[in-house]
A protein has these predicted regions:
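A short beta-turn/strand-edge loop motif at beta-sheet boundaries
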Residues: 204-210
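Hydrophobic beta-strand segments
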Residues: 211-220
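A short, amphipathic beta-strand motif
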Residues: 195-203
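The catalytic-center signature of Zn2+-dependent metalloproteases
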Residues: 100-170
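Catalytic cores of secreted or luminal carbohydrate-active enzymes
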Residues: 156-194
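Residues that flank catalytic or metal-binding motifs in active/ligand-binding sites
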Residues: 61, 148-151, 195, 209, ...
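Sec/Tat-exported extracytoplasmic proteins
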Residues: 16, 20-24, 126-130, 159, ...
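Propeptide-to-catalytic entry region of secreted or membrane-anchored zinc metalloproteases
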Residues: 1-114, 219-306
Length: 307
């Protein structure tokens, strides 16, 4: 019944809150507590319910709508199985936790990492992106054939990770007092990018003119790098190049993209290649690393390359 389910939710959110705060390892400026308030035990497609609240304000006195569905018993649910965070009407965030089975009820509360998964989705609610989307597989990297693994974080993998990265902590602290960050921090993700990236190149300790710089972009979902550089630059007589308009390089980048598909219309990581007399050096520029400048009150991210 409803009372028993509310009790189950209360116990579960005790887990979520305990994990959320402990994973901050003393770096949060606030104590965070999510309090479940059971509204309805529904008997319809959870996908249909989700679509209703994408268009209807629904819960003006609440901050997040959590929809739990333990079986894919409606045809429209299978295309949206799994756990994710999305937006609803009036800037309400919705967290959907939907089973992956069409035949058996999945006891989501019985999954030992479910509370960490919900914490991950609530991380999106607070404004943190998926760090795992910055991952590059070596086999999908035609530029230097090296794997890139993002920082350890609940927003990278919640299965076996028990901490927030410094990037996530900064964002969660920054948006902490907002009940609806989508409303109060509109466009925040793009605003975190610095305006510039300053690249400085030295050869044997001396500033080097004419070093070719290639900026190769990576895509979410594919975990790959596009071999054709998105942008190409060259250092000046000071051995420097100032890359400007950085927010628009990463987010909603202008063509040519040299790819037919760019998920979320964003480059998630850039690999900067510097070439001098046939020798090449590489620097990873994932969005979350470059955005750290926002919390340092700087408008330029510094890159130094030594040959």
């Amino acid at each position: 019944g409803k009372e028993a389910y509310q009790a189950k939710l209360n116990a579960f959110f005790d887990q979520v809150n305990d994990f959320w705060n402990k994973a901050g390892n003393g770096r949060f400026n606030y104590y965070f507590r999510y309090i479940p308030d059971l509204q309805v035990i529904y008997d319809c497609s959870s996908r249909q319910l989700e679509k209703i609240y994408q268009k209807s304000a629904g819960f003006p006195n609440h901050d997040v709508l959590l929809i739990i569905d333990s079986i894919l018993d409606f045809d429209d649910e299978e295309s949206a199985k799994g756990w994710y965070c999305g937006g609803g009407a009036d800037d309400l965030n919705m967290v959907i936790c939907r089973s992956r089975s069409k035949t058996e009820h999945e006891d989501l509360f019985g999954i030992d990492y479910f509370h960490r998964g919900v914490a991950h989705e609530f991380g999106h609610y607070r404004g943190v992106t998926d760090l795992y989307a910055d991952r590059i597989r070596a086999k999908n990297n035609p530029v230097n054939h090296i794997e890139y693994e993002p920082d350890s974080c609940v927003m990278n993998s919640h299965y076996k990770t028990y901490k927030w990265s410094s990037y996530a902590v900064h964002i969660i602290n920054h948006t902490a007092k907002s009940k609806r960050p989508r409303r109060d921090f509109d466009g925040f993700f793009k605003q975190m990018f610095p305006e510039n990236i300053q690249v400085s190149v030295k050869v044997k300790g001396k500033k080097q003119k004419g070093v070719k710089l290639n900026l190769c972009g990576s895509r979410a979902k594919f975990n790959d790098l596009i071999a054709t550089p998105y942008r190409t630059y060259e250092t000046d007589k000071k051995g420097e190049y100032l890359i400007t308009g950085v927010p628009n390089l990463y987010d909603s980048p202008a063509p040519p993209l040299h790819t037919d598909e760019l998920p979320y219309n964003r480059w998630f990581t850039f690999l900067l290649e510097a070439e001098y007399k046939g020798e090449k050096k590489y620097v990873w520029l994932p969005e979350y690393e470059v955005q750290q400048t926002f919390f340092e009150n700087k408008d330029t991210y510094q890159v130094t390359i030594d040959f």
